[in-house]
Amino acid sequence: MQAVIQTGPGTLQLTENVPKPSVEPGSRKVLVKVHAVALNHSDWKMVDFSAKPGAISGYDMAGVLEAIDDSMNSDLAVGDRVLGVTSIHGGAFAEYVVTDGDLLVKIPENMDFQHAASYGVGIVTTGLALYGNECLALNWPNTDGTGSAAPQKTRVGPRGWSGGDALTDNDNETPRIPVLVYGASTSTGTLAIQLLKLSGYEPIAVCSPHNFGLVQSRGASKCFDYHSQGCGAMIKQYTYNRLEYALDCITTASSMRLCYEAIGATGGKYVSLDPFNARVQRSRADVKPFFCYALTIFGLPIELSGEFARGAKPEDRKLAEKFVKIAEKLIEKGRLKAHPTMLKSGGLGGIASSIDLLRKGKVSGSKLVFDVVGN
């Protein structure tokens, strides 16, 4: 089969005649014939900083089940269309992949493979970041799309907890607790915005102004331009100095600093998707930071260097297995929409050059996807 192989730090190569993987008995794995794949920032970061020569790259894929281990106890069947994340070491950028069946999501009949491929990493990342006990530990959404967040009992501002410009003018409506999403127009950010709304919270977005329409269409009640001087102070004012939760999908010193500035006087929780800045961390003892690394959802040790190394976390695996089933229902009902996608040409052969677009920050508000079948 064809596959995109890591050949060294920062380099990928389309390789022919790579052995087709197979499902080992008792592994609880499945074999997927890949129809489409999507790019993530983790793809270039892994090959640049943690390259494993000979390993197949990629995490996001969508395809058709070709084989299922007999020990699997699930509703999956050969021929099902599925989407998901592959493994700790990647492997999605290939014509076939073996992965964990318990972490896959069935694709609705009305969705194509290109849009389906955009979900995987974002689903498990937001599931862990929003609902994991070490992360924001928020209330989960119900499978019918109704929120379960405990309402704030006392109104703080004239229109509710956080000013509520986009919520209601009705003083009888129960206000929602605000949650800040920095990098709201990323693929993970738009999923987080939707899940927060579905969970009963008020999503507040930070992104570029040209993406305000996108994040508002996904449920953001208020948008802030991160370029604006005093953006953190404006968010603090909007939330009446009581913001407690922030998810940082970008994770730089400046993004972390803005989130810390926005969090209210009583402190709160900050979750990053990359290692965070220690100097900013020390600026506020009342804010509890946590680096959420989504690869822990496989329940296995992560043998990487530095802050990326993690011991096995079986509790994250259990959370992921539970959450993908909720996400599957929400996607099926049209309550959890895919991030905008941009179909690139060349199939697997176009991946190496397109990853450089992510590396250089040339992609905004869309996710790059590639057809595998038919190329």
From Swiss-Prot:
Classification lineage: Eukaryota, Fungi, Dikarya, Ascomycota, Pezizomycotina
Quaternary data: Monomer.
Molecular function GO terms recorded: nucleotide binding; oxidoreductase activity, acting on NAD(P)H
The protein, known as: Trans-enoyl reductase BOA5
Expression induction: Expression of the botcinic acid clusters genes BOA1-13 and BOA17 is coregulated by BCG1 during both in vitro and in planta growth.
Cross-referenced Pfam families: ADH_N
Comment field on protein domains: BOA5 is composed of an enoyl reductase (ER) domain and presumably acts in concert with the polyketide synthase BOA6 that misses an ER domain.
Renumbered residue ranges of the record's region Disordered: 1-21, 147-168
Residues given in the record as substrate binding sites: V121, G122, I123, V124, T125, T126, G127, L128, A294, L295, T296, I297, F298
InterPro entries (UniProt xref): ADH-like_N (IPR013154), GroES-like_sf (IPR011032), NAD(P)-bd_dom_sf (IPR036291), PKS_ER (IPR020843), Trans-enoyl_RdTase-like (IPR047122)
Functional description taken from the UniProt entry: Trans-enoyl reductase; part of the gene cluster A that mediates the biosynthesis of botcinic acid and its botcinin derivatives, acetate-derived polyketides that contribute to virulence when combined with the sesquiterpene botrydial. Botcinic acid and its derivatives have been shown to induce chlorosis and necrosis during host plant infection, but also have antifungal activities. Two polyketide synthases, BOA6 and BOA9, are involved in the biosynthesis of botcinins.
EC number(s) given by UniProt: 1.-.-.-
Residues where NADP(+) binds: 42-45, 185-188, 208-211, 226, 273-274, 363-364
This protein's encoding gene: BOA5
Biased composition (Polar residues): 1-16
Keywords: NADP, Nucleotide-binding, Oxidoreductase, Virulence
Pathway participation: Polyketide biosynthesis
Family: Belongs to the zinc-containing alcohol dehydrogenase family.
CDD domains xref list: enoyl_reductase_like (cd08249)
